[in-house]
Amino acid sequence: FASVWDATRDGEIRARDYARLVLDNVATEDESTALRYALAQLTVAATTYSAPDHRDELLATVASELWALTAQAAPGSDNQFQFLRTFAQVAAEPAQLDHVQALLDGTETLEGVEIDADLRWELLTALVAGGRAGTAEIDAALAADRTATGAQSAAQARAALPTAEGKQAAWASVWEADTEPNTIVRTTGLGFRRAADVELLRPYVGAYFDALQGVWESRSYAIAAALIGGFYPSPLADAELRDATVAWLDANPEPPALRRLVSELLSGVERALRAQAKDAE
């Protein structure tokens, strides 16, 4: 998959064609790392590199076929586990979320799949992002998992709430307060960027750039880098985000280390726009 992925990133192959290649061939991939990379790339292709006009259709297809791959995989295999995790990351249609809910409730089972604490959080976060669960379910899950990992997973799930209020609370918890460790900042960013309706992130284009210099000057490098990388509203991946990023770079010649981080984020958006243009053909 690697060479085809490079061509997809370069805007030479349509994202939907890369997705089809992976879905048609990934079942026979027997090397765990290669499988993990292929599934991560499949997710990026469907969520970011696809043309917006047919993105929802592609995502629905990807999720449905990942569920089928999960059901068909050898019970207890690494493939089965990775297919299920990726399915949970992209599930958005009602029928797909029904499977997630049933697995979490125990009303549906897959031979070989054990719902441990980590997988339980991933399934719950999928339901939260899909509007099927909320703060009560997150609080209950955290009460049952009083570990550092549980706290991180709860922060990610809360930040994935698909409402303007949820995104604002996630933003405020780490940008306006300076009390959380790097691990919580990082997982909050993961949940914040998870948005089936990417327009939830639109208000943060301006807020992000307004706050950059301040967090760079006031936080440790590790925290600042986690904020800058984790809360850049990259799921928007459109001309408005690109132009705002270019404008900030034009207006801020210093400091070089901060500019370097932002320039790398700009490169990602520009790459996504090229890929989207190709996928629209």
Q: Where are each of the predicted segments found?
A:
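Long, ordered, helix-rich scaffold segments
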Residues: F1-E281
